[in-house]
Each structure stands twice: as C-alpha cells, then as structure tokens.
C-alpha cells in the first residue's frame, strides 16, 4: 500500500483519538485488533501513529514554537493532526525527505481542510525544517566539545601560546539562526 494512503489512514486514527479525547495508542490497539469494515491499517500508518503518540509533546512544542498566534490546541483537528504527522516525519523519521513530508501534508490539506490551511501548513512545516537544519546534530555538538576540550588542553600545556583572543562583549562571529515564525492570516 502506498505511503500516501498510509498517511491518510494514520490521519483518520489520530483524528478519531483527538475528537474522542481518547488515548492514541489505546485506539490504535482497537483498530489493529478489530479493523471493522476497514481494511487493516498499513504498517506505515501504525508506525506514524505510534511515532506521533511517542513524541506528541515534543512535536506540539515544536509546532507551538514556530507558529505565532495559533497554538496547536487552537488549530482545527484535521490541520493539527496533518501537522503532527508531517512534523514526526521531519523530526523523527530519516527515511522520509523533509520535502516529501511537506508535499504529502499539503496534499492532505488541499483535500481535507479549508482554503487557508495549505498555506499555513506549508509555512509552519517549512519553519520546522529550517530550524531543524539550522541546529547542529547532537553528535556534531559532542565532537565540537571534544575538539574544544583538546584545544584547551593543548593551550594549557604550551606556555608560549597566548590562547584565543576573544571579544569581551560576548558577541559571536556566528550568524544568528533565522527567525522562522509564521503569522496566520486573519480575514
């Protein structure tokens, strides 16, 4: 079954859990055990639902951080869950390119949401991607810390080395990460 179909089925499950205020994993277990008239959930739909359930707090915080004026809890149920699926794919599923996650979210939004939603979803997911790509990977941060530690050890053992001369103002030569906040359109 195509991943697009799996995303739609995952959205149905997340939507139902959200509308019923039911635990996502409990509902997923019900859907797996008793699919009813529907065909069984595809493996990728199950992976999405489990991933969103496991990381929902972090996903919602990330979406809140990059969306001004609209907190996740105030978004439409369909919009909110499309965003959660795509954010999970962007942040936690390296098998899906960011662009594909955004394109798939937009395809769902264009068929299931109101006219303003696709632009909002696109802007918010683009901001999430920008922030993700601007942040150093956890392993590269650890490597940099090891290198700095080695450099400071070498400087401490060499009395002729005068060390780094740094600006006492604390300013950094590194450019600031771009602000990626999205303003919702209000008519």
UniProtKB/Swiss-Prot annotation:
It comes from the Bacteria. The keyword Disulfide bond does not apply. GO terms for biological process: DNA-templated transcription termination; transcription antitermination. InterPro entries: NusB-like_sf, NusB_fam, NusB_RsmB_TIM44. GO terms for molecular function: RNA binding. GO terms for cellular component: cytosol. Residues 135-187 are annotated as: Disordered. Coiled coil: none annotated. Residues 141-151 have a biased composition (Acidic residues). The keyword RNA-binding applies. Keywords: RNA-binding, Transcription, Transcription antitermination, Transcription regulation. HAMAP family: NusB (MF_00073). Belongs to the NusB family. PANTHER family: ANTITERMINATION NUSB DOMAIN-CONTAINING PROTEIN (PTHR11078:SF3), N UTILIZATION SUBSTANCE PROTEIN B-RELATED (PTHR11078). NCBIfam families: nusB. Involved in transcription antitermination. Required for transcription of ribosomal RNA (rRNA) genes. Binds specifically to the boxA antiterminator sequence of the ribosomal RNA (rrn) operons. This is Transcription antitermination protein NusB. It comes from Bifidobacterium longum subsp. infantis (strain ATCC 15697 / DSM 20088 / JCM 1222 / NCTC 11817 / S12).
């Amino acid at each position: 079954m195509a991943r697009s179909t799996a995303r739609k089925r995952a959205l149905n499950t997340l939507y139902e859990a959200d509308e019923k205020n039911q635990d996502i994993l409990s509902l997923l277990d019900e859907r797996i055990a008793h699919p009813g008239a529907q065909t069984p959930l595809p493996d990728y739909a199950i992976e999405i639902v489990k991933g969103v359930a496991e990381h929902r707090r972090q996903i919602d915080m990330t979406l809140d951080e990059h969306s001004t004026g609209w907190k996740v809890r105030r978004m439409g149920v369909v919009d909110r869950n499309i965003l959660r699926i795509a954010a999970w794919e962007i942040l936690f599923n390296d098998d899906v390119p960011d662009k594909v996650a955004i394109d798939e979210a937009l395809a769902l939004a264009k068929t299931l949401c109101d006219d303003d939603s696709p632009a909002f979803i696109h802007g918010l997911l683009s901001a999430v991607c920008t922030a993700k790509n601007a942040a150093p990977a956890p392993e590269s941060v650890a490597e940099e810390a090891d290198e700095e530690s080695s450099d400071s050890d070498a400087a401490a053992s060499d009395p002729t080395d005068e060390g780094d001369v740094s600006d006492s103002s604390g300013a950094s030569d590194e450019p600031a990460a771009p602000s990626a906040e999205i303003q919702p359109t209000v008519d």
